[in-house]
Regions:
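Conserved, well-structured ligand/cofactor-binding cores
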Residues: 1-348
C-alpha cells in the first residue's frame, strides 16, 4: 500500500507541481535569452552570460531529473509471510501464484492516466512485482524515488539561493503585496521571504528523505519493525517539499527582471573582456597575451578605454584590431541566446 501511495502522490501531486515550476522557469529563460548579464564564479566577475541561459541551467537540470524519475518502477510484493508463497501453495498447490501476483500488480498500471501537461505527457512512476523478497519488500525502489525528489529539491534550492542574491543586488525586483509585512522593524523592506521559505522547507524535506534512504534499506533478517514508524513519516517529507514548491511559485509570481540594473552591472565591469582579448591575441601569435591582460586588469579598476588603448598599440592585423575594438561586455555572450533557442523543453 505504501508503494501505491508513493506512486500516486508523485504522479498526481508532486510531479504536476514540479512541472508548473519547470514551465515558469522555461518561459523566464526564453523571455530573457538575450539579456546580457555578468556571470560570477567564486563570487567574482566572470565571462558574461545571459540571464535566460542561466535560468535554463536549472530548467535543464530539472528535465534530466524528471527523465530519471520516469525510469523508476516501484516494486511491490504479493508472496506470503516470508516471501515463499508457503500458505498459498499449501492450500492451492496447482495454482500459478507467481504469474497471478505478477499480473495482478501489473494491472495497477492500468489506473495511470496521462498527464495534462505541455511538457510531460506520461506520468513517471509505474509499479512492478518483485518475486524475491523476505517478509517485506526491501524498499530500495522507494529510495530511488526519494533520491530523485531530493535532487530536484536541491536544484530548486540552488535556484532560490541564486534568485535571493539577484534580488539583493537589485537585478530582480519584487512587487510589494498590499498588507504584507516586509520587516517588523523596517517598514521599507520587501524581503525575499518566499524564496527563503522554499529553501527552508526543501532543507527539511531532504533531511527526512536522506534519513529514509539510510534507514529503509535495512531490516534485520527476514523483517524487523523499525521501518514501520519511519514509513508513517514519509508524508511529512512530501509535505515539506510541497510547501517549498508553493513558496517558490508564490515568489516567482512577485518578481520581475530589472534589465537596466543587470546591464549597468555588466557595462561597468569591462575587465571581463580580458578572456576574449587574450585568446584572440594568442591566435594572432602575440607574445604572452595572458600576462599582458593580467597586468592591466588583475586587481585593478579598468575601463573600456584601457582595452582600446591596448588594442591600438598591438602589432596585429587591422582585422584583429577591429574585432578587439568592437568587443563589448554586452556583446561578449557567446552562443548563450542560441543555447536557449535550441533547447527542447519536452520531457520524454
Amino acid at each position: 500500500s505504501y508503494g501505491l501511495m508513493i506512486r500516486d502522490a508523485v504522479n498526481n501531486v508532486v510531479v504536476p507541481e514540479i512541472l508548473s515550476i519547470y514551465g515558469k522557469l522555461y518561459k523566464l529563460a526564453v523571455e530573457h535569452k538575450d539579456l546580457s548579464m555578468l556571470a560570477r564564479t567564486h563570487g567574482q566577475p566572470a565571462t558574461p552570460t545571459t540571464f535566460g541561459k542561466e535560468v535554463l541551467v536549472f530548467v535543464n537540470r530539472m528535465k534530466e531529473e524528471l527523465m530519471q524519475l520516469g525510469n523508476i518502477e516501484i516494486l511491490l510484493k504479493l508472496n506470503g509471510a516470508t516471501g515463499g508463497f508457503n500458505a498459498h501453495n499449501f492450500v492451492f498447490p496447482e495454482f500459478d501464484w507467481i504469474n497471478f501476483s505478477h499480473q495482478l500488480i501489473n494491472s495497477f498500471n492500468a489506473e495511470i492516466t496521462p498527464l495534462d501537461n505541455e511538457y510531460m505527457h506520461t506520468k513517471p512512476l509505474k509499479v512492478r512485482f518483485n518475486p524475491i523478497t523476505a517478509q517485506i519488500e526491501p524498499h530500495d525502489s522507494y529510495l530511488r524515488v526519494f533520491d530523485g525528489i531530493k535532487r530536484i529539491n536541491n536544484i530548486l534550492t540552488d535556484f532560490a539561493m541564486d534568485t535571493w542574491r539577484y534580488i539583493s543586488d537589485g537585478w530582480i525586483k519584487q512587487r510589494a503585496v498590499a498588507g504584507e509585512i516586509g520587516s517588523s522593524a523596517m517598514p521599507h523592506k520587501v524581503n525575499p521571504i518566499d524564496f527563503e521559505n522554499a529553501e527552508g522547507n526543501f532543507g527539511m524535506a531532504n533531511a527526512m528523505f536522506e534519513f529514509f534512504v539510510r534507514k529503509l534499506c535495512i531490516s534485520r533478517l527476514q523483517r524487523d519493525l523499525t521501518d514501520s514508524t519511519v514509513e508513517r513519516n514519509m508524508g511529512c517529507a512530501f509535505a515539506h517539499s510541497m510547501i517549498g514548491y508553493a513558496s517558490l511559485q508564490k515568489g516567482l509570481g512577485k518578481i520581475e527582471v530589472n534589465a537596466d540594473k543587470i546591464t549597468e552591472a555588466l557595462e561597468t565591469t569591462p575587465e571581463v573582456l580580458a578572456e576574449a582579448y587574450q585568446n584572440l591575441l594568442r591566435m594572432s601569435n602575440v607574445d604572452k597575451p595572458y600576462e599582458r591582460l593580467k597586468e592591466i586588469t588583475r586587481g585593478k579598476k579598468v575601463t573600456i578605454e584601457d582595452f582600446h588603448n591596448l588594442a591600438k598599440n598591438l602589432d596585429v592585423s587591422d582585422e584583429v584590431k577591429a574585432r578587439l575594438l568592437a568587443a563589448t561586455p554586452l556583446t561578449y555572450t557567446g552562443l548563450s541566446g542560441k543555447i536557449v533557442e535550441q533547447f527542447d523543453a519536452k520531457i520524454n
